[in-house]
């Protein structure tokens, strides 16, 4: 019951579900990770959204009572247990429609990629996820554009918040995991 256009990965859910159905019906020899990659390919090439792998991967590789910590650069991942201790996760539908094809997602991603190209001219950086906040602050001047710098900063800082949230989950600390998500910009 995922509302279409709600920002809850409805298209990725349909892509992965379709893959599961076809695999099971026809007996295809493909892994869940393969199905995630096929879903991403479909989104990129047929829906026109230059999305990453995160949504499809989380759906295809999800594990009950766990979060997935995914390195999208090489698809390595670990599971982080979620012990809610009586707390509840609530997802509310605002009824505000959202579609990545109509959003600024492709533009934002392109801006992050351009910022990375500029930084790579002066420093070997594979991707924004490879940097700490301090490392970003040292090299951000190479970007040379305020908007591109903001986009890159968001990518780096968001990745660091994710790392901190995973550490909190691994320590059964769900309260420490909340502030990083709440500070996302």
Model-inferred region functions:
Residues 1-82:
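Gly/Ser-rich oxyanion-binding loop with an adjacent helix/lid
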Residues 66-185:
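C-terminal nucleotide
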């Amino acid at each position: 019951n995922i509302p279409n256009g709600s920002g809850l990965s409805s298209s990725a859910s349909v892509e992965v579900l379709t893959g599961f159905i076809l695999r099971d019906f026809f007996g295809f020899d493909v892994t869940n990770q393969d199905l995630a990659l096929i879903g991403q390919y479909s989104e990129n090439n047929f829906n026109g959204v230059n999305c990453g792998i995160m949504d499809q991967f989380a759906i295809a590789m999800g594990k009950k009572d766990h979060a997935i910590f995914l390195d999208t650069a090489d698809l390595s991942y670990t599971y982080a247990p979620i012990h809610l201790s009586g707390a509840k996760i609530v997802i509310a539908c605002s009824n505000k429609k959202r579609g990545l094809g109509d959003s600024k997602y492709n533009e934002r991603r392109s801006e992050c990629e351009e910022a990375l190209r500029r930084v790579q001219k002066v420093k070997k950086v594979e991707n924004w996820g490879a940097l700490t906040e301090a490392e970003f602050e040292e090299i951000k001047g190479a970007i040379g554009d305020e908007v591109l710098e903001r986009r890159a900063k968001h990518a780096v800082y968001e990745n660091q918040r994710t790392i901190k949230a995973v550490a909190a989950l691994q320590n059964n600390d769900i309260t420490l995991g909340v502030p990083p998500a709440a500070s996302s910009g």
